[in-house]
């Protein structure tokens, strides 16, 4: 996604989040939408 203010690792389930562009919940949902294999947090948990 390359959102400004966020970084994440696709090599494992770790995600580094800096809260200055989008709310974390929105970011996590977008990450799972873009990367279906990342399922540490269910995507539907972050909808809405």
Swiss-Prot record:
- Any idea what this protein is called? Cuticle protein 10
Gene Ontology molecular function: any one = structural constituent of cuticle
Lineage of the source organism? Eukaryota, Metazoa, Ecdysozoa, Arthropoda, Chelicerata
* Keywords of this entry: Cuticle
* Highest taxon of the lineage: Eukaryota
């Amino acid at each position: 996604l390359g959102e400004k203010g966020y970084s994440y690792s696709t090599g494992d389930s770790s995600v580094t989040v800096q809260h200055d562009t989008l709310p974390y919940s929105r970011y996590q949902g977008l990450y799972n939408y873009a990367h279906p294999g990342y399922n540490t947090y269910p995507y539907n948990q972050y909808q809405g």
